[in-house]
Structure formats: C-alpha cells, structure tokens
Amino acid sequence: MLKVEMLSTGDEVLHGQIVDTNAAWLADFFFHQGLPLSRRNTVGDNLDDLVTILRERSQHADVLIVNGGLGPTSDDLSALAAATAKGEGLVLHEAWLKEMERYFHERGRVMAPSNRKQAELPASAEFINNPVGTACGFAVQLNRCLMFFTPGVPSEFKVMVEHEILPRLRERFSLPQPPVCLRLTTFGRSESDLAQSLDTLQLPPGVTMGYRSSMPIIELKLTGPASEQQAMEKLWLDVKRVAGQSVIFEGTEGLPAQISRELQNRQFSLTLSEQFTGGLLALQLSRAGAPLLACEVVPSQEETLAQTAHWITERRANHFAGLALAVSGFENEHLNFALATPDGTFALRVRFSTTRYSLAIRQEVCAMMALNMLRRWLNGQDIASEHGWIEVVESMTLSV
C-alpha cells in the first residue's frame, strides 16, 4: 500500500497559534481518494530541522506533501530546505517570475523585490502551477519519496492538491478504489450508550465502526473497502435501527442545510424568536440559505410554556410566515421551545443539567434541539423525541 505522509511547516502551526486546517482537510480528502495518510509531522521555521525531517521521511514515505514556507519572507524556507536536502542549489524559474509580475500588474500593484524569492526552486524540481496565488508549488524526488511542496494559504493549497497533485499521483501510481464511508449523526444519546448496542454487531472483513463525539452530536461511521459495500449497506440498516430516533441526518451535509432545502421545496418561510440561543439559529439557517423572514433576538426572561406558545403563534401571523420557531430564556435548568405551523402550535418545556458545559456549548445544544423539532415536524413526526439527557417536563398544543 502506498505510504503517504504530510509535513506541516511554520512556527505558528507548531506552537498552536493557528489551527492546522490544511492538515485536517488533506487527511479527509486523501482518505476519500483511497490515499489515507500514514503519518503527519509538524516542524517550525528552522532550516536544519526542515532538512533533517525531509531526509528522514525520504527513507520511509512514498509520497510526502509539504505544506507552507513558500512565501517571500525570510522565514519561508521550504525551497531552500528541499535544495539543501538534495545537495543542489536554487535556480530562478523565469516563467513563474513573469507570471508573478503579471499577477501584480493586473491588480494595479508593483511586485516587491522580495517576491522574486518565490520563483527560486531547487534545480531538479518539477514546477507545479498555482492559478490563484503567487506561491508556485514544486515536486522533487528524494531517495524513495516523491515530495510535493505546497502553499500554506488554504484556498491555494486545496486548488493545487485537487487539480495538480492528485492527477500526478493517479498518473504515477496505481491507486486503490476509494473506501466506502457511511455516516449518520445522532443527537441526544451518549457515545457509550450507542457503543454498548453497536459493539455487538458483526463487522465484515476490513470494516470498522467509528464514533466521533462533538457536543451536542455524535457521528457514527462505518468504513471499509469498496469490495464490502453490499455487506456494509446491509449492516447499515442495523446501525440505523439501533440509533433509532436519535438520528438527525445521514451523510455530511448537516442539519441546517437539509432543513433549508426542505423549507424551500415545500415553500415554507420561517421567522425566528431567540432568547437563550442569541441568534445562533438564525446564523446557522441563514448560512444554509434558509428562507428566513424577520428574526429577532430578545433578552432572556421568565415565561411559562403557554406564554411562549401564544407569543410565537402571534409572531407567525404578524409576519405572514409559513412557520415560526421560538427558543425562550434558560432559567433554573428549564427552557421552552415552540413551533407555530399551519397545523397548530407545538411547544415543549425541557429540563437538562448543563453545569459542566460552557455557555457556547449550552447554546449549541439548545439550537440543535430547536432544529430537531423543526426537522421532525417537516418529516411528519411528533416534535418530541427521546433524549437520554434531556427531559421533557411539559408539552402543549394550540389548535389553529
């Protein structure tokens, strides 16, 4: 199996001053291309350290993706490190120098002398185009390893990997079929509770069951070779049965996007009134393109479930909205939710202890609860579902 590794560079990455989103993206992208990473390393802006790890990994990896260090400043050392590791010098790539000059000219800017450095590549390097920036990439062969050097800017990095590097890998190596990965996301049940039921399932050869907990959701993943797809799809029915009502969506699209699409398909507009969630619902749904009307965030106040239900019913009528959704303030571990629809208004009062969680997490939980109510109504289900750690203490319905 092809051994693919990644090397992230830069003091800011090494010291945790920025999150290495490029590494996470590459690992996921390559995994779904049948190229799972076998190792990831991070090195700071130190020439000796860079040269050392390039030489070291060249003895073990078949492919190494090096990210960062291609800029015009003194701490951008990747090209020099590659040349030093190979025992050769840097040469000026005249065509890229002209391309950079054109890039700046089209934007009404003068290229700084320091940018010339970005056109200096190891003598044996293969040039890799960057159509969206000034940091070209390059590839070198060092011992057994084919190394690709890429820019640190995420938008440039992704374009280069997808359109330049992956085609080269497919041309040079015989790549396996991408693995099959079935995913669903649950809300309201603990990871241990799900695992207790799912761990008894008999998995096909080479297939693994994975869990990813990110409060307030848990993602279940069944991953395996393409040759086992039929068996995995059969097993997936058992996984969904065990997860039961806690399943809120399948795949990776996300609940706000799925709700947005359903609202649009059914030509429902939605108005929101938020207290405890502080506009989080509006943010999530607007980013997904949901058909929102007037949305409000009001200070938290104590109110009965009946008050919340009557208020959101009036709001739906006043704004001529198809649907209206309300989240009350959070008082003494209690919270109200209400959804006004053409069929009537449905309201829940819930209790859950959240002292161990931050305010941001508590707001995420409440936003997910509200979205799940909306999802269930759109799917023709009762708005309340069983949640192991959220107790429904009161419910009511207002007729149309």
UniProtKB/Swiss-Prot annotation:
Quote the Pfam families the UniProt record gives. MoCF_biosynth (PF00994)
Q: Where is the signal peptide?
A: none
Q: Which family does it belong to?
A: Belongs to the CinA family.
Query: What's this protein's function?
Result: Does not have nicotinamide-nucleotide (NMN) amidohydrolase activity.
Task: Output this protein's name.
Answer: NMN amidohydrolase-like protein YfaY
Organism in which the protein naturally occurs: Escherichia coli (strain K12)
Q: Which gene encodes it?
A: yfaY
